[in-house]
Amino acid sequence: MCNKLEQVFSQLANAEISNKDNVYTIVVAKENLRQAAETLRNNDIVRFDFLRDIIGMDYTDSLGVIYNLSPSEDLSVIVLLESRTDDRENPAFDTVEDLWLSAPFYEREVHDFFGIRFLGNPDMRRIFLRQDWRGYPLRKDYDSSPIINPIPLENEDLDALEYLPVLDLKDIDKERKSVFDKGDFVVNFGPQHPATHGVLHLRVSLDGEVIKKVDPNFGYIHRGIEKICEVSMYHQILHLADRLDYLSGSINRHAVCMAIEKGIQLEVPPRAQYVRTIIDELTRIASHLLGWGAMAMDMGAITAFVYGMRDREKIMKIFEKTCGGRLMANYSMIGGLMEDIHPDFQKDIKEFVVYMRKMLREHHILFTGNPIARGRMEGVGHLTREQAISIGATGPVGRASGWQCDVRKIEPYAAYDKAEFTAVLREGGMTFDRYYIRLDEIEESLKIIEQLVDNIPEGPFCAKPKPIVKLPEGEYIQRVENARGDFSVYINSRGDKFPYRVKFRSPSMVLVNVLKHIAPGNKIADLIMLGGSLDYVIPCIDR
């Protein structure tokens, strides 16, 4: 692979290339950015067809962007494509929205928070903040005075969302075209609707009962978590990570801990590694049970939801005994675990594994084999493997389309290399495949837990870091496999006790982008079911 990468990198014009911990950093001038992106995406040697994220940066004297890229055939390879501009008044880069289907949302996010324009992107509306918001919050010189942005007393006018502005260097505010075609019948779905699974606003245009277009609107519970991280010490960031995807809180927290531990070169005791892995897999099972039950309830099967919550409650009780918390376990900390496991931890888990295997069979009998439910799910909401990669759909959604993207297999962390399990794949890419694969993953999680729970090493449960943690200057990336896919943490440190920049990669944001692509052509009655099959979590998107 190294020789192939060298061949690809040799095609880049005037690029500075470095490698640290198998992460390649490529720095190019802004006039060469588009050519570099095209080369990485379209070359015939190693195609970087997976755009994991676009990270906006304020370097004080300049503004920049970082494209986090990997080839879908070898996700262990990470390339950070960086570029900067000294023009803080009118910062602009060429768009890459035609190269990756994930790019439009990412570019809108960078524009929203940094004011960077992406020339050629036809939709440069703000994506989290109101369209009338003044300033760019993640810039270092941002003025947060409430006088500039007072608390609004009225809802945002929907007309503000209707027009797509052209963002070039000459005429910034010119209205280019409407989101929908003239005469379209548009339905507002959410943000206060139980089937959106959170405060998500979807504007849906219809031709009769058939969906023509879906326009998602985020930000109703945007909390500025990445901005808060910049004024928080590293141990404080852990509590913010829990509150992104709250159904994968322990897994997200694990990712932040590993990023920090990697930076300060702190070795975590084996006992903590095993317990972290078990907690992560219990969290995954709990999330999948809730996702399974919620999707079934969206389709009218309330009994399935009740059964899913009943089974999930057993996991919550295990968490409560050992961690003290339920949904927010607050268990992993820098160096290991907050406390050692409860004396009943292993006994309770072994009982749960036996119970859950029996219940999985019951769940399949109850709902999977139901001919009405199966008839609604099969042949609906097709997502091809190529689309999944270009949109960046990882986790169960990506694997249901035949893409092997499980971080636990690609880059084993904690104690995953001590357990044998299968990263389940399905080839259909339909709603039924996305439904079924989560039940399969519960079985694989039970296998992992079963292999580890009787082999938890003796010894300390935590390695004690310094009271005030300071990461050495540099960039740190850590990714984990949470219940919805590749959750990545990017930390840029200047050697201080506060991070200079923190970026969380939201797998749920990508899943709403999937909905935007698979919903057209389906009936409006199936929109709720399609969203349920994707299992996105809104606080993870809004951050």
List the model feature ranges, each with a label.
Residues 131, 165-197, 205-543:
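Active-site bordering "gate/hinge" segments
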Residues 1-210, 369, 373-380, 387, ...:
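Terminal low-complexity/charged segments
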